[in-house]
């Protein structure tokens, strides 16, 4: 069995298929792990979701911020923007099935035998593995409830839950987990989240900000952390236990696949429109 990890697909389905063909991916023997943001901006979010749903146990995804936003769009909590290219997906006859499937997906996954942890944006340096498991489980449980739109999705859009508080309860606790695992890039020196700067570290002009992965973390020392979200990094992180896989395919760059067993990255350039 081979374990393949893919960066933010964001509807770039043709590039994904080219990439999987390069490694002769076979769902009967291999697993495809995806760092989230399966949808939005690229030309075929519908085919992308259908494909991952069809993989069954051979597909392992975590939710990204765009995937959570799709839940809000489907629930009529937000309006669809043409630039996101989500109208065909939202109008699809099987949209309810796809949404139900998406709601069953977690914010983190782990591969214990290889000491690999996958989230969309990263892991707060303050968190142990036990805390990560606990907090992501709370969000997953909320997503599976019948009132998930009112109780969670409608209340997740805020920049106020930027500081980890282990005594927080209810929606405030869930908000921090969502913000950290799906939106995080930089932290202030005191450890709270910044939501504004998206530049690569060499271009960040705020001396108070540091990338989340530059803070001391016992989890990062013991595990390989696989993440996406931060396209401006273009996969370049100077640390052996970090695998940054978002390489901006939907922005015209390329899609990246990481073969765990070979510790090898394979890429596919964005295809030109025919």
Curated annotation (Swiss-Prot):
It comes from the Bacteria. GO terms for molecular function: bis(5'-nucleosyl)-tetraphosphatase (symmetrical) activity; phosphatase activity. Keywords: Hydrolase. Its EC number is 3.6.1.41. One of its GO terms (biological process) is RNA decapping. Gene3D superfamilies: 3.60.21.10. It is an enzyme of class 3 (hydrolase). The keyword Cytoplasm does not apply. One of its GO terms (cellular component) is cytoplasm. It catalyses: P(1),P(4)-bis(5'-adenosyl) tetraphosphate + H2O = 2 ADP + 2 H(+). Hydrolyzes diadenosine 5',5'''-P1,P4-tetraphosphate to yield ADP. Belongs to the Ap4A hydrolase family. This is Bis(5'-nucleosyl)-tetraphosphatase, symmetrical. It comes from Shewanella oneidensis (strain ATCC 700550 / JCM 31522 / CIP 106686 / LMG 19005 / NCIMB 14063 / MR-1). The lineage of its organism: Bacteria, Pseudomonadati, Pseudomonadota, Gammaproteobacteria, Alteromonadales. The gene is apaH.
């Amino acid at each position: 069995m081979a374990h393949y990890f893919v960066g933010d697909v964001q509807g770039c389905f043709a590039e994904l298929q080219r990439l999987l063909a390069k490694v002769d991916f076979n769902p009967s023997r291999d697993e495809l792990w995806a760092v989230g943001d399966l949808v939005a901006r690229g030309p075929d979010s519908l085919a992308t979701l259908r494909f991952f749903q069809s993989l069954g146990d051979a597909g392992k995804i975590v939710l990204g911020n765009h995937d959570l936003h799709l839940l809000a769009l489907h629930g009529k909590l937000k309006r669809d923007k043409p630039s996101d290219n989500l109208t065909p997906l939202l109008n699809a006859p099987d949209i309810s099935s796809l949404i139900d499937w998406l709601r069953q997906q977690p914010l983190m996954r782990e591969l214990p035998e290889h000491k690999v942890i996958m989230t969309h944006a990263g892991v707060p340096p303050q968190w142990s593995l036990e805390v990560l498991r606990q907090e992501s489980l709370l969000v997953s449980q909320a997503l599976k409830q019948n009132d998930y739109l009112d109780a969670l999705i409608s209340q997740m859009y805020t920049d106020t839950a930027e500081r980890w508080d282990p005594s927080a309860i209810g929606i405030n606790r869930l908000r921090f987990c969502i913000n950290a695992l799906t939106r995080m890039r930089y932290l202030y020196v005191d450890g709270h989240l910044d939501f504004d700067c998206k530049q690569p570290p060499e271009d960040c002009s705020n001396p108070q900000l540091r990338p989340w992965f530059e803070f001391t973390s016992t989890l990062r020392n013991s595990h390989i952390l696989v993440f996406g979200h931060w396209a401006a990094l273009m996969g370049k992180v100077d640390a052996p236990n970090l695998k940054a896989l978002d390489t901006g395919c939907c922005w015209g760059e390329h899609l990246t696949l990481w073969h765990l067993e070979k510790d090898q990255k394979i890429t596919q350039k964005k295809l030109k429109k025919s």
